[in-house]
Amino acid sequence: TICHIQISKTHGILKTCEENSCYKMSVRGWIIGRGCGCPSAVRPRQVQCCTSDKCNY
């Protein structure tokens, strides 16, 4: 799976991941992270996971 990886608040890259999923993590609507896999979330964080290429933009 090809996922967006968040390097900083304004910079990201695309990466081919071994995992079959990507995630986007947010707090109150603000995106705080993107990456490979599907980590569990701890409130107030929310995680959206997906399985297609570049789906976590």
Curated annotation (Swiss-Prot):
It is found in: Secreted. It should provide a tool for further understanding of the effect of M2R in various arteries and may position itself as a new drug candidate in cardio-vascular diseases. Gene3D superfamilies: CD59. Keywords: Disulfide bond, G-protein coupled acetylcholine receptor impairing toxin, G-protein coupled receptor impairing toxin, Neurotoxin, Postsynaptic neurotoxin, Secreted, Toxin. It holds the Pfam family Toxin_cobra-type. GO terms for cellular component: extracellular region. Expressed by the venom gland. GO terms for molecular function: toxin activity. Disulfide bonds join C3-C22, C17-C36, C38-C49, C50-C55. The keyword Secreted applies. It comes from the Eukaryota. When tested on muscarinic GPCR, specifically antagonizes the type 2 receptor (CHRM2) subtype (Ki/Kd=120-399 nM). Ex vivo, it reverses the M2R-agonist-induced relaxation in rat and human arteries. Negative results: does not show activity on the muscarinic type 1, 3, 4 and 5 receptor subtypes (CHRM1, CHRM3, CHRM4, and CHRM5) at concentrations up to 100 uM. Belongs to the three-finger toxin family. Short-chain subfamily. This is Dendroaspis polylepis MT9. The lineage of its organism: Eukaryota, Metazoa, Chordata, Craniata, Vertebrata.
